[in-house]
Regions:
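ABC-type ATPase nucleotide-binding domains, specifically the catalytic core motifs of the NBD
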Residues: 15, 71-73, 93, 97-112, ...
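The feature captures the beta-strand-to-loop junction immediately N-terminal to the Walker
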Residues: 36-38
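ABC ATPase NBD coupling module
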Residues: 67-81, 105, 224-228
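Conserved ABC ATPase signature
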Residues: 133-137, 141
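ABC ATPase "signature
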Residues: 218-219, 227
C-alpha cells in the first residue's frame, strides 16, 4: 500500500546556512511530487528528511501517519526506497548482488525472486544482466539497476534525488520509460528532486518550487505555468520555455 508523506514546519541548518525554513508539505498516498528549484534551495534536504538520512533541527516528519523517528530503521528501508544521483552502486558487486542488498538489509533474506522481479520490471533481463558489474553497463542501465534495488523489497514510497540528471538524452529517455512502467505497475508514492521542469512534467503529478529553504509555490505544472505566484516561479517557466524554443529552432 502506498505511503503518505508529510513534513510539518521543518527547519534545518548547515552551520549558518539555512537549508529548510519552516517547510510544510503533505504528499498523498500513490501520488508523484517533484521538487524543483536552484541548487541550495533545500530540495535534497527535504527529500532526505523522509528516510532519516537527515534529522532536522525542528519540525515533524510523518510516514504513513507515524512519526518517522518512531519507525525502526530496517522497517523504514523496507517501506521507502532511495535512488541517489549517481546510483550508488557498489562497483565490485554484480548487478544481482547490488539489487539484493536492500532485501538483506531489511531482513528479507537474499530475495532471489524479488531481485529477478525488480530487474524484469526495469527491463533488464536477469539472465543477461545479473552477473554483470556496474562498469559493464551504460549510464541508463546503471540507473535502472539503482531503481530496481530501491524496489526490491516492494517499497511503498520511493525517493529519487536527481537520478537522471547526468544521463545523455537517450539513456535518460530509457530511464524515464522504465520508471513510468515501474510506477504504473507498483503504484508507490514518489518524491523526485530535479532541475528539469520537462522531467517534472513527465514523471510527476504535482510540482513544488523551492527557493532559499522555503516553498515558493506548489500545484500542477499547468497551474504553475498559467498562474505563477511569484516572479521567481514565472522566471523558471520562462527559462524552460526558452530552452525548448531554442531546441526546436536548432
Amino acid at each position: 500500500m502506498p505511503l503518505t508523506l508529510e513534513a510539518q514546519e521543518l527547519r534545518h541548518c548547515y552551520g549558518d546556512t539555512v537549508a529548510l525554513d519552516g517547510v510544510s508539505l503533505a504528499i498523498a498516498a500513490g501520488s508523484a511530487v517533484a521538487l524543483v528549484g536552484e541548487s541550495g534551495s533545500g530540495k535534497t534536504t527535504l527529500l532526505r528528511a523522509f528516510n532519516r538520512m537527515i534529522v532536522c533541527k525542528s519540525g515533524r516528519v510523518l510516514v504513513g501517519g507515524a512519526p518517522v523517528d518512531a519507525i525502526a530503521p530496517e522497517l523504514l528501508r523496507r517501506r521507502i526506497g532511495y535512488v541517489p544521483q549517481q546510483g550508488g552502486l557498489l562497483p565490485h558487486w554484480t548487478v544481482r548482488q547490488n539489487v539484493a542488498l536492500v532485501p538483506r538489509l531489511t531482513g528479507a533474506g537474499d530475495g532471489a525472486a524479488a531481485v529477478n522481479d525488480a530487474l524484469v520490471l526495469v527491463s533488464l533481463e536477469p539472465s543477461r544482466f545479473g552477473a554483470r558489474y556496474p562498469y559493464e553497463l551504460s549510464g541508463g542501465q546503471r540507473q535502472r539497476v539503482a531503481l530496481a534495488r530501491a524496489l526490491a523489497s516492494n517499497q511503498e514510497a520511493v525517493l529519487l534525488d536527481e537520478p537522471f540528471g547526468a544521463l545523455d538524452a537517450i539513456s535518460r529517455t530509457e530511464a524515464h520509460e522504465a520508471f513510468e512502467r515501474v510506477r504504473s505497475a507498483r503504484g508507490f508514492t514518489t518524491l523526485l528532486v530535479t532541475h528539469d521542469l520537462a522531467e517534472a512534467a513527465r514523471l510527476a503529478d504535482h510540482v513544488v518550487v523551492m527557493r532559499d529553504g522555503r516553498i515558493e509555490q506548489a500545484g500542477t505544472i499547468g497551474a504553475l505555468r498559467e498562474s505563477p505566484a511569484t516572479p521567481y516561479v514565472a522566471e523558471l517557466f520562462a527559462r524552460a520555455a526558452a530552452a525548448h524554443t531554442a531546441l526546436a529552432r536548432a
